[in-house]
Design a protein with these regions (language model features):
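Residues within membrane-spanning alpha-helices of integral membrane proteins
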Residues: 63, 70-73, 96, 100, ...
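Aromatic-anchored segments of alpha-helical transmembrane domains
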Residues: 32-34, 99-108, 175-186
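N-terminal transmembrane-helix/juxtamembrane module of multi-pass inner/ER membrane proteins
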Residues: 1-74, 118-121, 130
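Alpha-helical transmembrane segments of integral membrane proteins
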Residues: 19-27, 89-97, 168-173, 193
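Membrane-helix interfacial "entry" motifs
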Residues: 12-20, 55-59, 82, 86-87, ...
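Membrane-interface loops
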Residues: 39-52, 81-164
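Hydrophobic faces of alpha-helical transmembrane segments in multi-pass integral membrane proteins
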Residues: 26, 30, 34, 93, ...
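Membrane-embedded catalytic cores of phosphoryl/pyrophosphoryl-handling enzymes
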Residues: 131-220
Length: 220
């Protein structure tokens, strides 16, 4: 059953080995606090831009995978929490480490981008959604892209989970991840530099989180 593993969870045993992974969920209030503080108090200095950005048109269709990121994040978090706790631990360790590095970059290298269109060629519901996103999600603290980093973290998690080892699941996860990464530049939320930075950070942290246990087994 879905909740069998947590059926005897209470305040007295929440710190036990069986349940202490739940404290990783404290990542979210800490993350959101850092997000709000950096948005409010960090003044951007460096403009992130690449000539490649000029060749990428705005395309509102990418709102779909961009918003899908939130559902993808919720799915991986909830599924691993209940059905694959080792993967949950790795995923949230990845989120914690990469977020600390990302926010440190935002503070030490306060950045922004000026890629958003002033006007929109088309007028439809997807453009309206994007206008609302622009109001909520500012054009500051963009490099590296958290959308990209978290998406790749989800991809690593699924690919390293026995529950998602089929070719179908792996293909779907790759397609979703690539679509989300492309959405960040086609919606003018990020520069291509932000993608490269996000990929670089994710790949650099990958072996320390996802290959740690495998390397220990080989040594034994």
């Amino acid at each position: 059953m879905l909740f069998d593993y947590y059926c005897d969870l209470n305040l007295k045993n929440i710190t036990s080995v069986k349940y202490r992974h739940l404290f990783l969920l404290l990542f979210w209030p800490v993350y959101l606090t850092l997000f709000v503080l950096t948005e409010k108090y960090v003044t951007p200095i460096y403009n992130v831009y690449s000539p490649m950005d000029d060749f990428i048109p705005f395309c509102e269709l990418f709102v779909i995978p961009y918003v899908l990121w939130y559902a993808f994040l919720a799915f991986v978090s909830i599924y691993t929490l209940f059905f694959d706790i080792p993967s949950f631990k790795k995923f949230y360790t990845f989120l914690c480490v990469t977020s600390v590095i990302t926010f440190a970059i935002y503070i030490l290298f306060p950045n922004m981008q000026n890629l958003r269109p002033d006007t929109f060629v088309r007028d439809n519901i997807l453009v309206d959604v994007m206008k609302n996103l622009y109001e909520v999600d500012t054009n500051t603290n963009v490099c590296p892209s958290i959308h990209v980093v978290f998406s790749i973290g989800m991809l690593f998690t699924l690919w390293n989970s026995k529950h998602f080892s089929s070719a179908l699941w792996r293909t779907v996860s790759v397609v979703i991840t690539i679509s989300i990464c492309l959405a960040t530049v086609f919606l003018k939320q990020h520069s291509v530099i932000d993608i490269f930075a996000g990929v670089g950070l994710s790949v650099a942290i990958f072996p320390f989180v996802f290959l740690k246990e495998k390397n220990k087994c080989k040594k034994m």
